[in-house]
């Protein structure tokens, strides 16, 4: 359970009888936040299992308390505060909760731009909970918060909260360069795992591959879908936890996997990805993976694949090409 959730559980008296919308939930336990309140949960993260899985929430009628766990991205916080202000017709109580060392103090200036009477309500588990009265604002359009980035002769759409929002990250750039310089063979079926803004999906589709993109983020799924459409390309973009929405086998898996799970650094996601990939690859299928070079992926790749090579590297990143026997 997240520390922020544990702090919220201390607020049982304040939650009793309330109609609560949890926005951008970061913990499945938030679905059972209070037995004495009506709790509706929105999440951008597919793995939360929320009632609403979407880039931005719809505020149910009768909601009298908005609970917002602090995102890692201040752009995401700005977007959500503006969005929520545009979704309410009258001032509504809002709680912002986040780690003391995770940017909660820096987030206050964004909170105070939309909220009256900001107060520190509680502090525990290295987290702080602030409250205030969110004022109604202008109705927002998701598209207005999108950023279009140009990569070579293609375009991609990004939204606040999507990995590397508004720019091409160094790892993905190296991965694209490595694939561009390699004979990938006859285009077939490919999975872009953790598709983000869809830069890699667009590149693959432009080179004739039948693309399936997967991401846990609803914002990323929306962005990748729009990126393909913007370039006049076809592909299927899905929400899911790694390979969960995939049926059948493919010729290639391409990924720039995350090594953070919410705020915690982890290699568990990539370890699962490497272990599960052979189940979804045809014989002779290939996994392309880019990662920070200090991360311990070589042994896991060697355990799962018959041939592993470093296709490209810099002082910070390494691109692996792993072939299934």
Curated annotation (Swiss-Prot):
Keywords, alphabetical: Cytoplasm, Methyltransferase, rRNA processing, S-adenosyl-L-methionine, Transferase
- Which Gene3D superfamilies does the entry mention? Vaccinia Virus protein VP39 (3.40.50.150)
Q: What class of enzyme is it?
A: transferase
The record's InterPro entries line, in alphabetical order, gives:
DNA_methylase_N6_adenine_CS, Mtase_sm_N, rRNA_ssu_MeTfrase_C, RsmC/RlmG, SAM-dependent_MTases_sf, Small_mtfrase_dom
Task: Write out the annotated subcellular location.
Answer: Cytoplasm
Name one cellular component (GO) term.
Answer: cytoplasm
Q: Which reaction does it catalyse?
A: guanosine(1207) in 16S rRNA + S-adenosyl-L-methionine = N(2)-methylguanosine(1207) in 16S rRNA + S-adenosyl-L-homocysteine + H(+)
Read off the CDD domains from this record: AdoMet_MTases (cd02440)
* Predominant place of localization: cytoplasm
Q: How does it assemble?
A: Monomer.
Q: What does this protein do?
A: Specifically methylates the guanine in position 1207 of 16S rRNA in the 30S particle.
Q: What's the name of the protein?
A: Ribosomal RNA small subunit methyltransferase C
| Species this chain originates from | Alcanivorax borkumensis (strain ATCC 700651 / DSM 11573 / NCIMB 13689 / SK2)
């Amino acid at each position: 359970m997240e520390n922020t959730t544990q702090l919220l559980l201390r607020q049982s008296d304040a939650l009793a009888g309330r109609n609560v919308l949890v926005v951008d939930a970061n913990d499945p336990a938030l679905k059972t936040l209070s037995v004495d309140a009506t709790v509706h949960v929105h999440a951008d993260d597919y793995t939360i299992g929320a009632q609403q899985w979407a880039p931005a929430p719809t505020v149910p009628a009768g909601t009298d308390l908005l609970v917002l766990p602090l995102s890692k991205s201040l752009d995401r916080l700005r977007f959500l505060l503006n969005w929520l202000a545009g979704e309410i017709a009258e001032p509504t109580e809002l709680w912002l909760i986040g780690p003391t060392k995770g940017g909660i103090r820096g987030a206050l200036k964004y909170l105070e731009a939309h909220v009256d009477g900001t107060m520190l309500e509680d502090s525990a588990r290295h987290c702080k909970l602030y409250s205030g009265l969110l004022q109604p604002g202008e109705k927002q359009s998701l598209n207005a918060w999108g950023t279009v980035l140009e990569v070579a002769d293609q375009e991609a759409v990004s939204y606040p909260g999507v990995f590397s929002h508004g720019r091409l990250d160094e790892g993905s750039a190296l991965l694209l360069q490595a694939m561009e310089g390699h004979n990938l063979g006859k285009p077939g079926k490919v999975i872009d795992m953790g598709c983000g803004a869809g830069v890699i999906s667009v590149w693959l589709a432009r080179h004739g591959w039948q693309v399936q993109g997967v991401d846990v983020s609803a914002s990323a799924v929306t962005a990748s879908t729009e990126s393909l459409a913007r370039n006049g390309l076809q592909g299927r973009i899905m929400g899911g936890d790694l390979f969960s929405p995939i049926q059948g086998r493919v010729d290639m898996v391409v990924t720039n996997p995350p090594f953070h799970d919410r705020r915690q650094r982890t290699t568990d996601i990539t370890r699962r990805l490497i272990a599960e990939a052979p189940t979804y690859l045809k014989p002779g299928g290939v996994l392309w993976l880019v990662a920070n070079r200090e991360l311990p992926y070589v042994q896991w790749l060697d355990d799962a694949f018959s041939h592993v090579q470093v296709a490209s590297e810099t002082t910070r990143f390494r691109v692996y090409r792993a072939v299934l026997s």
